[in-house]
A protein has these predicted regions:
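Short, Lys/Arg-rich flexible segments
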Residues: 1-176
Length: 176
């Protein structure tokens, strides 16, 4: 309200309420993705690591692709204009800064989940789908054989559904 008063304007009650929500939101950060304490199906690996490996891809020691990059987290950037429009609508239609933050977080989370489910990604390797034995060159004492169980889905990024289902958003308040 100080800006409006500085130039001799007064805001309508709706305008004042929107300005208050904006002021509250100026100290809010919405983080969307995977938390370090979330575990993958093997209960040893963090889901954040699995998401990172799949988003950026991984390489064998010889430089060949082990896991191709499937940048599903870029869905927010890809749909930034849509998210911006959604945010403006949320700001004008919702009563509190918390409601606005939750609506934006939920929308961004849905964008990532939809990307996992709907985008066309590099296909899975046959061993990923069918299962079998392969050498893991990253064993502590050199290459070791590991068993790949095979996936329940041929679609990349979909196996147990944990990556899609466990995407979260966290709202952090305070000075940035």
């Amino acid at each position: 309200m100080a800006i409006a008063n500085d130039i001799g304007l007064d805001l309508t009650p709706d305008g004042r309420a929107a300005m208050e929500r904006l002021n509250e939101l100026s100290n809010v950060t919405i983080e969307v993705g995977y938390q370090a304490d979330q575990k993958a199906a093997d209960d040893e690996t963090s889901l954040a690591e699995v998401a990172y490996w799949n988003h950026y891809g991984t390489l064998h020691k010889d430089g060949s692709v082990m896991i191709p990059a499937r940048p599903f987290m870029d869905a927010i950037k890809k749909h930034s204009e849509e998210l911006s429009e959604f945010s403006q609508q949320a700001l004008s239609s919702l009563e509190t800064a918390d409601a606005v933050s939750n609506a934006i977080g939920s929308q961004a989370k849905s964008m990532i989940q939809d990307a996992i489910k709907d985008e066309e990604w590099a296909p899975n390797a046959p061993i990923t789908i069918e299962g079998g034995w392969m050498m893991n060159e990253y064993g502590k004492k050199g290459p070791v054989p590991v068993h790949i169980k095979g996936k329940s889905s041929t679609k990349p990024l979909i196996d147990t559904g944990a990556l899609r289902q466990n995407c979260q958003y966290v709202i952090k308040k305070g000075k940035k």
